């Protein structure tokens, strides 16, 4: 009986050690614990980033600032704009907060009109799209949690000069597989 207990104990210790060993290799980098100020009208890294169509996007909270928990952009816009194709994220919730101007945002089959101070959450795996509908300057905060590869996605968007949904089937597949974004429809009309 004692030999059986010893074998069972050894088996259980080995079994319990497996998840600990797997998790040890997946530890995320801890945030620095240092506050980061990003001034109005500038990017976290002092970069000038542009969305397709020429509008600016400023990184306000970088992926590295939160060890991957959150990524935040500020997107000022000066013209009516249809926004990105209707899409969803496999792993990220997307949050929109209107600082200035008027926007329309669709989440699933719901349509929301945003004015300054309003916000909308687009849960992961739920199709969403947004458009700037105002007649003056607009400014929208767009956040992602967890951050995933969204910061990298914005860098690639700038290099490409167009959204993945406007490209070939291979472009759409790359967006889906690498960034976890699937385009499911056209942009909204402003």
Model-found features: residue ranges?
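Glycine- and acidic-residue-biased ligand/ion/polar-headgroup-sensing regions
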Residues: 93-103
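Short beta-strand segments
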Residues: 84-86, 107-112
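Acidic/histidine-enriched, glycine/proline-rich intrinsically disordered or flexible terminal extensions
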Residues: 156-190
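Ligand-binding loop in jelly-roll beta-barrel domains
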Residues: 124-151
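C-terminal segment of N-terminal export signals and the immediately downstream linker at the start
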Residues: 25-56, 159
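A short glycine-rich, His/Asp/Glu-containing loop-to-beta-strand
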Residues: 49-86, 92-93
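N-terminal secretory signal peptides and thylakoid transit peptides that target proteins
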Residues: 1-19
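Short acidic-glycine-tyrosine-enriched beta hairpin
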Residues: 110-124
């Amino acid at each position: 009986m004692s030999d059986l207990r010893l074998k069972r104990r050894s088996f259980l210790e080995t079994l319990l050690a497996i998840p600990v060993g797997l998790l040890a290799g997946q530890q995320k980098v801890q945030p620095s614990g240092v506050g980061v100020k990003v001034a109005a009208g500038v990017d976290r890294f002092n970069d000038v980033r542009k969305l397709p169509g020429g509008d600016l996007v400023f990184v306000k909270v970088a992926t590295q600032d939160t060890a991957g928990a959150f990524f935040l952009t500020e997107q000022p816009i000066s013209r009516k704009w249809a926004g990105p194709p209707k899409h969803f994220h496999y792993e990220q919730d997307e949050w929109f907060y209107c600082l200035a101007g008027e926007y329309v945002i669709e989440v699933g089959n719901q349509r929301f009109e945003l004015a300054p101070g309003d916000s909308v959450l687009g849960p992961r795996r739920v199709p969403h799209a947004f458009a700037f509908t105002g007649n003056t300057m607009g400014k929208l905060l767009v956040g992602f949690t967890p951050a995933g590869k969204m910061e990298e996605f914005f860098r690639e968007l700038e290099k490409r000069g167009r959204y993945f949904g406007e490209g070939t089937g291979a472009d759409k597949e790359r967006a889906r597989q690498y960034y976890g974004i699937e385009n499911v429809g056209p942009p909204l009309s402003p």
